[in-house]
Amino acid sequence: MSDYLSVSTLTKYLKLKFDKDPYLERVYLTGQVSNFRRRPNHQYFSLKDDKSVIQATMWSGHFKKLGFELEEGMKVNVVGRVQLYEPSGSYSIIVEKAEPDGIGALAIQFEQLKKKLSQAGYFDDRHKQLIPQFVRKIGVVTSPSGAVIRDIITTVSRRFPGVEILLFPTKVQGEGAAQEIAQTIALANEKKDLDLLIVGRGGGSIEDLWAFNEECVVEAIFESRLPVISSVGHETDTTLADFVADRRAATPTAAAELATPVTKIDILSWITERENRMYQSSLRLIRTKEERLQKSKQSVIFRQPERLYDGFLQKLDNLNQQLTYSMRDKLQTVRQKQGLLHQKLQGIDLKQRIHIYQERVVQSRRLLSSTMTSQYDSKLARFEKAQDALISLDSSRIVARGYAIIEKNHTLVSTTNGINEGDHLQVKMQDGLLEVEVKDVRQENI
C-alpha cells in the first residue's frame, strides 16, 4: 500500500527541486506587465503572454536601479530566478533586471522624462532667454581635454578677438558626471561678470551622452540666470539639455557663432557707415546755415539800418519844436506884463515912475531869468531823457542787452497778432541772424 504525502511535504519537496534546479536559478523571460501598481518599496505584478501568467516580485533595491518607469501593459524582458512560495504552493519569478522589449531602457527613460519635463513647462518658449548681441566673457562647461573647448576658443577668437573665455572643467560621461555637470553650471552662475554659458561635449553613443539627459542637469540649465547654449554630440544627437537650453547648436563651432552674433567686422562696418552718415549730415547742415546767412545779409535790417530809429528821430524833432514854442510863449507873457506895468507907470511921477520901473525891470529880469533857467533846465532834462531813450532804442544796444529784433517779411514784429503757426520769422541777435519757424502761438499778458 502506497504512503500518502502531506501537502506541506510535497510543497517542501517541490521547493527543494526549484531551489536546486540550475535552469531556474537564472531565467530570461519575456512577458507583458499586468496588475502593476507602484508601491513605496517592493513591487508586485504579473507577467503574461497569450496563454499563461506568472507572478513577479522585484525588491526595492533592484527596482530603484531601473532606468525607466514600469507601466501597465508594457512588454518587457526580465532576468531573475524562479522560486516556490510554500504557504500557498505558488511559484513566482524574482526579477533582478528588466528592460523594455524592442527598444532600450535608455530610450524609454528618455521619452518618459521628456514627457514629464515638458508637462512641467521646462521646455516652454516663455522661459527662453535671449542671447546678448555683445558679450565680453563666455563661460564654457565641458571637459578640459576635449576638442569642444579648442573649437570654441578658435571660433570666438576669429569672430571677436576681445571676448574672454572662461573654462569650467567637468566630467561629461560616466558615473557621477550628471551631478558634476549640474554643480558646475550652478558654480558658473555665481560669476557676476559672465554674459552667457556654453554647455556641451563631443559626439558619442547614447550611453556616453546620457549625463545630459539626467533630470539634475536639465534643472540646472532651467534655473540658470545666464543664457545657456547647448552643444551636445553631433548634429543628429538630441538630448534633454538641448530642449531646455535657450539655444541649441549642432557643433561647438556653431555654439561659438551663436555666442558671438555680432563680429568685429560687423562692428567696424557699422562704425564706417555711421561715420559716412554723420559726414553727409554735417555737409547738409553747413549748406543750410550758409543759405540762411546769405538770406540774412539781404535782410532790410542790414540794407537800411536807419529804418530802425527813424521814428525816434522824428520824436526828437517834435520835442525840440515843443521846447522852442514853450520858450516863445513865456517871452510873450513877460512882454505883456511889462506893457501893463508901463501903463501903470504913466500916472506916476517920472522919477518915481522911473524908480518903480527900474525896480519892476529888475524884478522882471529876475523873474525872467528864473523862469528861463527853470524852463531851460526842465526842457534840457526832458531833452536828455528823450536822448537817452533814443540811444537805448538803438538796435545794437537793444540786442547787446539780451533782446532780439523780430521781423516778418522785412516788417518789424512787436505783437503776436498776425503771427500764425508755420510762419517764418527773422530774429536779429547780437552776433547774427536766426531764421525760425513758428510752432505755436500763445497770447499772454506780460
Curated annotation (Swiss-Prot):
Presence of keyword Zinc: no
EC category name: hydrolase
Originating organism: Streptococcus agalactiae serotype V (strain ATCC BAA-611 / 2603 V/R)
EC number: 3.1.11.6
Subunit structure: Heterooligomer composed of large and small subunits.
GO biological process: DNA catabolic process
PANTHER family per record: EXODEOXYRIBONUCLEASE 7 LARGE SUBUNIT
Protein localization: Cytoplasm
This protein's name: Exodeoxyribonuclease 7 large subunit
Annotated keywords: Cytoplasm, Exonuclease, Hydrolase, Nuclease
CDD domains: ExoVII_LU_OBF
GO cellular component assignments: cytoplasm; exodeoxyribonuclease VII complex
Similarity remark: Belongs to the XseA family.
Cross-referenced InterPro entries: Exonuc_VII_L, Exonuc_VII_lsu_C, OB-fold_nuc-bd_dom
